[in-house]
Amino acid sequence: MKLSPATKSFIGKTVDISTFAIQWGFVPFVVYLGFKKGAEPMPNGQILPLSAMSLLWG
């Protein structure tokens, strides 16, 4: 299938713009999702007693 030069140029520009948007938009998007969801609840600080029996049989 032959593509005209205008179509090739359009596809090239589209790929360039998409690459730019993905490269520069990924980190801000992840930060946005982190702020939107919020932090996980903090642990209550309770110290669990560990022994060989609790490690083996829960």
UniProtKB/Swiss-Prot annotation:
It is found in: Mitochondrion outer membrane. Keywords: Membrane, Mitochondrion, Mitochondrion outer membrane, Protein transport, Transmembrane, Transmembrane helix, Transport. One of its GO terms (cellular component) is mitochondrial outer membrane translocase complex. GO terms for biological process: mitochondrion organization; positive regulation of protein targeting to mitochondrion; protein import into mitochondrial matrix. It is a single-pass membrane protein. Pfam families: Tom7 (PF08038). Disulfide bonds: none annotated. Forms part of the preprotein translocase complex of the outer mitochondrial membrane (TOM complex). This is Mitochondrial import receptor subunit TOM7 homolog. It comes from Caenorhabditis elegans.
